[in-house]
Amino acid sequence: MTLKASSNTAPLAAAEATARASADLGRLPEWNLADLYPAMDSPAYLSDVARGEIDCRAFADKWRGKLADITAGPNASEKLTEAVKDYEALEDLLGRIMSYAGLIYSGDTTDPHRAKFYGDAQERITNASSDLLFFTLEINRIDDAALDKAMSAGPLAHYRPWIEDVRREKPYQLDDKLE
């Protein structure tokens, strides 16, 4: 049996037809994303990305390897609440950045400039967020009784639903290096 090169031009024809149809539509409306950032190269966006990278590293330096000891010590509810609030603020910031980048890209997925912008944002935020992976893993290694005690009274009780959601993943959690 000999293999013959395919002469199927259907995908190319479909792409050309889509391009012609898009051109026929004229200028389409665009989302106003100014509530997130004024532009892809705005100082506010660039500053938030840099701050996210720095703050993720600082978060890891401050909290990595310490959650179990904090839970066993005095003022566990207050200290763990501080850690969860720090984590929450970082997740909000990173989410804002990626929401903006994703919406910019979704506005015109054929624009290579937007595709590069989205890819660059994804790479930087993925790298930064790798410094946050330890947090939920460590929460799941805390003794159940100690964590329940910390959540029973004090400000950590506010985060009980989120912590319980994190704890549901405990049976499926892998070793830190594999995660």
Predicted regions, residues:
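A well-structured
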Residues: 2-179
